[in-house]
């Protein structure tokens, strides 16, 4: 059955600087910083958490429905999503804004300078979660990083519609205070964060992971640990789900989104959270072997038994 993917759609512009930032930036002159970097390589990727999650979930055989916002330059992205067979009926096109864009410069030491323009993501809350009367087939959902208002509103709307969802605050976690996090976690069925985000979330809500995992109505809390796998917390108990060795490590962009697609695929089918997380680990290891968040290809065998 369909899964509602609430999150961002963005263009990622990725460049590489063959030198070192440290050799170009003088610490004693940072108050008058004015630098320019020659970047011989440039690539533009389809990105955004909603797009990345939907891309992988569709390859798994899922039925993602994207709820997100594109700007006046998003026509090509919308057409691509549709060419992949993705349901874009809930995508908002905002003519007064550009599509969200992330611009990254990476130096020879893998240090990064990133600029992010939210664009249409800032008005993503204008798109609304369908009510049961409008669409009764939505079996599961996810609140992935998006505009702050969109994440808050869509969580409330999914909860009101009776759609069980994963709360995946990601890089937007600092945008919410402790009371807001407690409110959204209280509406969610599952929470997914990385280890750094887990520490920050616990600090914000004022409790540890065992206590947070006992939140009434919460069926599980997943903490990803990169190559080490992930921890699955349920009612105060934790299970370590081992990581999967990647064939090659090329680009971590979108690995977390691929993992979350695995969670959605398994949970929608009634799998245990541990089994769903194991699929997520396999997908993350596969994704890291390709560049960009939407260029990897899946073999049917990755789903397993």
Where do the PLM segments sit?
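Gly/Ala-rich phosphate-binding loop of Rossmann-like dinucleotide-binding domains
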Residues: 58, 159, 268
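Glycine-rich phosphate/adenosyl-contacting loop at the front of the ribokinase-like
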Residues: 1-65, 76, 249
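Alpha-helical transmembrane segments within multi-pass membrane transporters and channels
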Residues: 69-71
């Amino acid at each position: 059955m369909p899964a509602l993917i609430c999150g961002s759609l963005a263009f990622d512009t990725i460049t590489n600087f063959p030198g070192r930032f440290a050799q170009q930036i003088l610490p004693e002159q940072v108050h008058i910083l004015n630098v320019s970097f020659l970047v011989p390589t440039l690539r533009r990727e389809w990105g955004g958490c909603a797009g990345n999650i939907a891309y992988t979930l569709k390859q798994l055989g899922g039925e993602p429905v994207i709820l997100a916002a594109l700007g006046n330059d998003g026509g090509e992205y919308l057409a691509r999503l549709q060419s992949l067979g993705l349901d874009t009926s809930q995508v908002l096109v905002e003519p007064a804004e550009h599509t969200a864009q992330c611009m990254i410069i990476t130096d020879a030491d893998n240090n990064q300078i990133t600029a992010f323009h939210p664009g249409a993501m800032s008005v993503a809350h204008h798109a609304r979660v369908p009510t049961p009367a409008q669409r009764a087939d939505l079996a599961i959902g996810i609140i992935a990083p998006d505009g702050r208002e969109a994440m808050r509103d869509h969580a409330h709307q999914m909860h009101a519609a009776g759609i069980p969802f994963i709360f995946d605050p990601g890089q937007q976690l600092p945008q919410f205070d402790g009371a807001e996090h407690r409110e959204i976690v209280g509406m969610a069925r599952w929470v997914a964060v990385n280890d750094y985000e887990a520490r920050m979330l616990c600090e914000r809500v004022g409790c540890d992971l065992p206590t947070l995992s006992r939140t009434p109505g919460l069926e599980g809390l997943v903490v990803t640990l990169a190559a080490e796998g992930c921890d699955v917390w349920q009612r105060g108990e934790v299970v370590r789900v081992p990581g999967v060795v990647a064939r090659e490590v090329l680009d971590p962009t979108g690995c977390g989104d691929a993992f979350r697609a695995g969670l959605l695929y398994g949970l929608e089918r009634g799998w245990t959270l541990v089994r769903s997380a194991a699929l997520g680990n396999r997908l993350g290891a596969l994704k890291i072997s390709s560049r960009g968040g939407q260029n990897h290809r899946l073999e049917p065998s990755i789903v397993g038994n």
